A protein has these predicted regions:
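C-terminal, non-catalytic "cap/extension" segments appended to globular domains
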Residues: 2-32, 38, 42, 226-228, ...
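Active-site-proximal, well-structured secondary-structure segments within enzyme catalytic domains
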Residues: 142, 146-147, 185, 189-230, ...
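His/Asp/Glu-rich acidic catalytic environments and adjacent acidic regulatory segments
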Residues: 2-42, 46-47, 93, 100-302, ...
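Short, hydrophobic/amphipathic alpha-helical patches that form generic packing surfaces
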Residues: 79-90, 148, 152, 254, ...
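Membrane-entry segments of alpha-helical transmembrane domains in multi-pass membrane proteins
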Residues: 28-40, 63-70, 264-268, 307-314, ...
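Short pre-active-site segment immediately N-terminal to the catalytic Zn-binding motif
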Residues: 463-482
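C-terminal non-catalytic alpha-helical accessory regions
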Residues: 44-139, 562-574, 578-594, 601, ...
């Protein structure tokens, strides 16, 4: 036992000093939850101190002494404390949260929003920025973009408002920030609260062995007998696709599609309504008629009219085929169930699978044995090597935040260090559903000319391994991996001076191009042959099976397109509101996407209350971006199809002109530099087999 006067080494907050880790990676093992709040508050204090120095600088404002310092990525310190702690905390909140994290997020959200407002609404600071904006020297394209972004960022945050307007804006943005956080926390709790517990093995009828094993493992982990199914995609999707138990499918479907609507503390209905109104008020306070007008100024689409044109063009092109696809499903169901059978939404995946089996003799479970996760990783990494010459080396020296996470060092084709890549593969308690890419550190060039390399992370919810089998993925999960890996390449290839313009820091309707571009490879036979080997026998996937994958790529493609379009219509319906939004969410939703719907709508289901993208994920008035980027990716990939899907010269052009440039120039300028022309919808229609 130590005596009271024993001198002990005082523990230091890891965020306050150099990490002294490989590549300055996050020392997760040394970070305690109390470190976050301390670092947030100290980071705010340091920011305030730097801003005070800046506004009192006696020298005339210049690009270097004002804009670069405001950008806060190339300051005197080699890192920005507030940015440093924020990136780690944000990742943990979505990938490895707990009640303490949630409570801290609730506490810090208004404090951080207030600080952001204090910066953007600082009159003396804006005067310096405005002076540079109006009196700057000749700038490079990247410097001009940074200056424009800086000035516009302050104006769009209320710098030109009077004091009363600024105070009103503070209140609106702080409330919106808190409600967005509440929305996400409610949704996560709703998602994790529901389970379908089965103890009668007969009720597993139709389910493949992989789904049964995963459910048995879930039950075991929950100290329950039998089998446990959840609303996480790797559990939910196989049940809806294969289970012959129609009533259980209904229960699972209704649980997932009514999240956030129940009479409990996790209800999101009023939160959604309030967020729509808050964003409209913010936009109108800043001189825009609608929130969509406010957002689309800095998008390739430019305005709501162009967004609606894209969505309506897609409806016109795809709807006839989508209607026929649904009729084919209904015929398939009636052949089995009789002419009086009425297909419900919880039957859709089940009969879609049956129809796919009849037409192509293909189903996800046939493919799983060939998509062992470790082999898929090799295939995806190998694709990057073949295209760009980069290589990946797993590192046990780089700390991770959970045992599921793997860390890799990435090296460029000349052998130089390129990036750190983290991969977090499987669902677990405290982890949000879905898949996303994030960064623990961006890329920039510091004052000494050192190219600081990025640390990127992809977070997914792929099928878990069981006691009997390794993680065996579906083709859809392989596609998800490729999608997020495309985002990560955008981050890893970043090569810009300023971090705020690097990697994925681009306009939102351009950001999905690199990710959706990579999805194209999931049905390319030459790529599949590089890694699709049976996990037991080592035999390659038979050519006949690969051919069936390629032939079936457009199965239900028109329906899938209209489903995405419907989400885009819903998003635009909310954020083109000019007056106070007072409608009931659920009926409003049904009306908003009606023209894109080709299947039955249920009165109680609701997408809005779980639509994280547009309520809490930055895609408000921007969900159309997925279809916009799909036009771009189909057009871009057509060049690879012409020159060879592994053509290194084409890949180098894609890297040099798009992936490495970030947001340093207008996206269309970058795209045309790669493609030689603006994109058209033709390549997308051709890829999907749609004729106009």
């Amino acid at each position: 036992m130590l005596e009271n006067n024993t001198t002990q080494t005082e523990r230091k907050n890891p965020f306050f000093e150099p990490y002294n880790t490989p590549h300055d990676t996050v020392p997760f093992n040394r970070i305690e939850i109390g470190d976050y709040e301390e670092a947030f508050l100290e980071g705010i204090r340091r920011d305030d101190e730097e801003i005070e120095k800046l506004v009192n600088d006696p020298e005339a404002p210049t690009f270097e002494n004002t804009i670069v310092r405001v950008d806060n990525e190339n300051g005197e310190n080699y890192y920005d404390l507030l940015s440093r702690v924020s990136t780690v905390f944000s990742c943990m909140l979505s990938a490895e949260t707990c009640d303490e994290f949630d409570a801290l997020a609730q506490k810090m959200s208004p404090i951080l929003t207030k600080h952001a407002n204090d910066v953007k609404l600082n009159k003396r600071l804006f005067e310096r920025i405005k002076y540079v904006y109006e009196n700057h020297r000749e700038l490079t394209a990247e410097e001009q973009m940074l200056l424009d972004n800086c000035y516009d960022g302050f104006v769009r945050s209320g710098a030109l408002l009077d004091d009363e307007g600024k105070e009103r804006l503070r209140n609106l943005t702080e409330e919106a920030s808190l409600l967005s956080l509440q929305f996400s926390q409610n949704l996560l709790k709703e998602n994790k609260a529901f389970t379908l517990h089965i103890t009668d093995e007969a009720q597993l009828d139709g389910l493949p062995e992989t789904a049964r094993e995963a459910a048995a493992l879930a039950a075991k982990e929950a100290d329950k007998e039998g089998w446990l199914f959840t609303l996480d995609y790797p559990s939910y999707s196989p049940f809806m696709t294969y289970s012959t138990q129609r009533e259980l499918r209904r229960q699972l479907y209704m649980a997932r599609n009514t999240e956030g609507t129940h009479d409990n503390t996790e209800n999101n209905l009023e939160i959604c309504k309030r967020l729509v109104n808050l964003r409209r008020e913010i936009a109108q306070l800043l001189g825009y008629e609608t929130y969509a007008d406010y957002v689309l100024v800095h998008r390739m689409a430019s305005n709501a009219k162009n967004v609606y044109k894209l969505l309506n063009d897609l409806i016109d092109a795809y709807r006839p085929t989508a209607v026929e696809e649904v009729k084919a499903l209904e015929r398939e169901a009636k052949q089995t169930e009789g002419d009086d059978f009425v297909m419900e939404p919880w039957d859709f995946s089940f009969y879609s699978h049956k129809l796919q089996m009849r037409e192509y003799n293909l189903d996800a479970e046939m493919l799983r044995p060939y998509f062992e996760l470790s082999k898929v990783i090799d295939g995806v990494f190998g694709l990057a090597t073949r295209l760009y010459g980069i290589t990946f080396k797993e590192s046990k020296d780089i700390q991770v935040y959970h045992p599921d996470v793997k860390a890799y060092e990435v090296f460029d084709k000349d052998g130089s260090f390129l990036a750190v890549f983290y991969a977090d593969f499987h669902p677990r308690k405290g982890k949000q559903g879905g898949a996303w890419m994030t960064e623990f550190q961006g890329q920039w060039i510091d004052r000494k000319g050192v190219n600081v390399r990025p640390h990127v992370s992809v977070v997914m919810n792929l099928t878990k391994p069981t006691d009997e089998k390794p993680a065996l993925l579906t083709l859809g999960e392989v596609e998800t991996f490729l999608h997020e890996f495309g985002h990560s390449l955008h981050g890893m290839f970043a090569n810009t001076r300023f971090e705020s313009l690097s990697g994925t820091n681009v306009w939102w309707d351009f950001v999905e191009l690199p990710s959706q571009f990579m999805e194209n490879y999931s049905v390319e036979k030459e790529f599949l042959r590089t890694f699709a080997f049976h996990y037991k026998t080592g035999e390659p996937m038979p050519d006949d099976l690969i051919e069936r994958i390629v032939r079936s790529r457009n199965f239900m493609a028109a329906y899938a397109c209209l489903r995405q379009v419907s989400f885009g219509l819903l998003d635009m319906a909310y954020y083109t509101q000019k007056e106070e939004f007072a409608a009931d969410i659920i009926p409003f939703e049904k009306k908003a996407w009606e023209k894109a719907m080709v299947t039955k709508q249920l009165p109680d289901t609701c997408m809005t209350t779980q639509f994280s993208h547009i309520m809490a994920g930055g895609y408000a008035a921007g969900y159309y971006s997925y279809k916009w980027a799909e036009v771009l990716d189909a057009d871009a990939f057509s060049v690879f199809k012409k020159n060879g899907i592994f053509d290194q010269k084409t890949a180098q052009s894609f890297r040099d002109n798009i992936l490495s440039k970030g947001g340093t120039e207008h996206p269309m300028t970058l795209y045309k530099r790669f493609r030689g022309q603006e994109p058209t919808i033709d390549a997308l229609l051709e890829r999907n087999g749609i004729k106009r």
